[in-house]
């Protein structure tokens, strides 16, 4: 399990992308109706299902705060210790205003090594989980808002019974750096069709 692979914090690298469980490939469908409870009313209790797709876990030893957040944390520690805090200077304030916040991306690649999706990921210190919905990005010539159910347009499903890879990358001031990975994501068809159809590649 994931917890068994964790080491003491002082021995952990800067970032660790953990191996993932095989993901089940299927099409979600509503059971009670178009909305969560359908027409059953609020007396019906429902709970969230586990995230659909491949759940990708990673650990950040220190996190990647913005310059403003790092300065404010240092100032808070000084105030808690009973010390005063000085104005950092206009140069520092202007640099913080112009800074582009560090960003983490989980990069999904297919068997040929081509990038098929990039997932936004939290940059805070600690353990995080991000779910990939097993879909390509949505490409539309016109921006389409979410529908009345709050669902945004999505891309096509990826091919089942195939291996994909995930990498964890950090982007700071436009420069990307690989932190961890790649790890393999196996996508398995959940059920076999009753009738034999065409090959999935067709």
Could you tell me what each predicted segment is?
Residues 1-202:
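C-terminal low-complexity, glycine/proline- and small-hydrophobic-enriched intrinsically disordered tails
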